[in-house]
A protein has these predicted regions:
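Acidic, Gly/Pro-rich loop/turn segments at junctions of secondary structure
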Residues: 117, 128-194, 249-254
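Short helix-boundary/capping micro-motifs
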Residues: 12-27
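A late-sequence structural motif
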Residues: 106, 258-303
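Central regulatory/effector-binding core of bacterial HTH transcription factors
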Residues: 91-154, 227
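A short LG(V/I)-centered, amphipathic sequence patch enriched
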Residues: 41-58
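Secondary-structure junction motif
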Residues: 148, 181-182, 188-189, 195-217, ...
Length: 303
């Protein structure tokens, strides 16, 4: 009979790509993961890892076995969720991947709330970009993602995942203090034709929003600089290098050289918690969603 922990180690290597990353996700040492894989190779009489450059990669047989392991681990997760539901107390480890501004502006309060209410719940946070986190949940790399989409660019979930809305994060046009629009009560997208934009790189949710919104207004956005983090975008705006749309969550105080102007219509970023359907009955999932919504209620709209 195949050992579940060894299958878990193989699945982790398949998800994370390297033995070192798999070990970090499992809380093991790399040598311990390698030993588990070696034992699984002896159990199956099959080569599972092969040398590739300076590292290793899964063989074709290993990839197929990892797919089966994923299904088995899903059944185990469902069984564990049912047992936790019967006990009624959130417990065990729950790994959460949150996008940067949520990790900064939302999650510290959530972690503190859950730690005080449920000491048996071991919540682990990772800061992960939203274009990656949902896939990590689907692959079993994390238990939950705190992610977002925009009203004009809705998110489609892969099969087997569930979500719950946390709240709606409003965004503002951010411009240098001396900008021609700095004193306006509000501005429409049509008035932004020709403006130099600073935004996140192509492929990111925020970049997709900008392109869709400006094209709908009849022009192509002229993106001159890109950066991953909103504080960097604000710094570029402060230097007079462009304008940006910055959500309010986790934004923090702005430099004196930067002002915000409301947009009409207001850009809305929608926040979600996403998890695998097998874990839906876990009290830990329900309680984390509760804490997220409660914390959102206290920070929503903060500048």
């Amino acid at each position: 009979m195949l050992d579940l922990q060894r299958l878990r180690a193989l699945h982790a290597v398949a998800v994370h790509g390297t033995v070192n990353a798999a070990a970090a996700s499992l809380g093991y040492t790399p040598s311990a993961v390698s030993q588990q894989i070696a034992k699984l190779e002896r159990e199956t009489r099959t080569v599972l890892l092969e040398r590739h450059g300076r590292g290793v990669r899964l063989t074709e047989d290993a990839r197929r076995l990892a797919g089966t392991a994923r299904e088995l681990l899903g059944l185990v997760e469902r069984a564990e969720a049912e047992l936790e539901e019967r006990r009624g107390e959130p417990a065990g480890r729950l790994t959460v991947a949150a996008f940067p501004s949520a990790a900064r502006g939302l999650m510290p309060g959530v972690l503190a709330d859950l730690a005080s209410r449920h000491p048996a719940l071991d919540l682990r946070l990772s800061e992960v970009d939203p274009h990656l986190s949902v896939g990590m949940v689907a692959k079993g790399a994390v238990d939950m993602a705190v992610t977002h989409d925009w009203d004009v660019a809705p998110m489609t979930l892969p099969p087997g995942l569930a979500r719950h809305g946390i709240g709606e994060d409003l965004s503002d046009l951010t411009v240098p203090r001396g900008h021609r629009l700095a004193g306006r009560d509000r501005v429409r997208s049509e008035e932004l034709a020709g403006e130099p934009w600073v935004c996140q790189p192509p492929g990111r949710v925020c970049h997709d929003w900008l392109v869709r919104t400006m094209r709908a207004a009849g022009h192509e956005p002229r993106v001159v600089h890109t950066a991953d983090e909103n504080p960097t975008l604000v710094a570029l705006v402060a230097a007079g290098l462009g304008v940006a749309v910055i959500p309010r969550l986790g934004r923090g105080p702005l430099p004196e050289d930067v002002v915000t102007v409301p947009m009409d219509p207001v850009p809305v970023r929608r926040l979600y918690a996403v998890w695998r359907e097998e874990a839906a009955r876990r009290p830990a999932v329900a309680e984390t969603v509760r804490a997220l919504r409660a914390r959102w209620g206290s920070v929503a709209g903060e500048p």
